[in-house]
Amino acid sequence: MDLPGPIHDFLLVFLGSGLLFGSLGVVLFPNPIFSAFSLGFVLVCISLLYILSNSHFVAAAQLLIYVGAITVLIIFAVMFMNDSEYSTDLNRWTVGDGITSVICTTILFSLISTILDTSWYGVIWTTRLNQILEQDLISNSQQIGIHLSTDFFLPFELISIILLVALIGAISVARQ
């Protein structure tokens, strides 16, 4: 979208805060249904960020695949769980929780220090030059197809395998 600067900045801050609070809701809500709905909200915010960056095809794919299918699949799987499976040990803090917290905190601070130490001026100009050259040659849909079949072939296949395993797991839970 070609919006004026202040409106674009406001929408970025609004969607960023929506992402932040939604992701906190995914982690902190005790009820898995609320966590799944919060995940859906986060994925919608990501799709709106794609729309702000003029990637309408990626935004539509984000809405259809992740919000429309994955979130519904997660809610479907959570609906089959018994209440006692997720509410009995909420207040216990294990060693694994502590190790995970330390690892996640370390990753967070390393990302923050990397972001603060990066010279964004050079990155922005390099990105703009590459976008101009690629946009002159082919469209966005063709770029996505080329990148999925060349640069991102392995992650694309891994995601399809993960989705297949999730679907098989949902079917096995539904049969029990």
Swiss-Prot record:
The chain crosses the membrane at residues 10-30, 32-52, 61-81, 95-115, 152-172. Pfam families: Oxidored_q3. Keywords: Chloroplast, Membrane, NAD, NADP, Plastid, Plastoquinone, Quinone, Thylakoid, Translocase, Transmembrane, Transmembrane helix, Transport. It catalyses: a plastoquinone + NADH + (n+1) H(+)(in) = a plastoquinol + NAD(+) + n H(+)(out); a plastoquinone + NADPH + (n+1) H(+)(in) = a plastoquinol + NADP(+) + n H(+)(out). The keyword NAD applies. It is a multi-pass membrane protein. GO terms for molecular function: NADH dehydrogenase (ubiquinone) activity; quinone binding. Its EC number is 7.1.1.-. It is found in: Plastid, Chloroplast thylakoid membrane. One of its GO terms (cellular component) is chloroplast thylakoid membrane. InterPro entries: NAD(P)H-Q_Oxidoreduct_6 (IPR050290), NADH_UbQ/plastoQ_OxRdtase_su6 (IPR001457), Nuo/plastoQ_OxRdtase_6_NuoJ (IPR042106). NDH is composed of at least 16 different subunits, 5 of which are encoded in the nucleus. NDH shuttles electrons from NAD(P)H:plastoquinone, via FMN and iron-sulfur (Fe-S) centers, to quinones in the photosynthetic chain and possibly in a chloroplast respiratory chain. The immediate electron acceptor for the enzyme in this species is believed to be plastoquinone. Couples the redox reaction to proton translocation, and thus conserves the redox energy in a proton gradient. Belongs to the complex I subunit 6 family. This is NAD(P)H-quinone oxidoreductase subunit 6, chloroplastic. It comes from Aethionema cordifolium. The lineage of its organism: Eukaryota, Viridiplantae, Streptophyta, Embryophyta, Tracheophyta. The gene is ndhG.
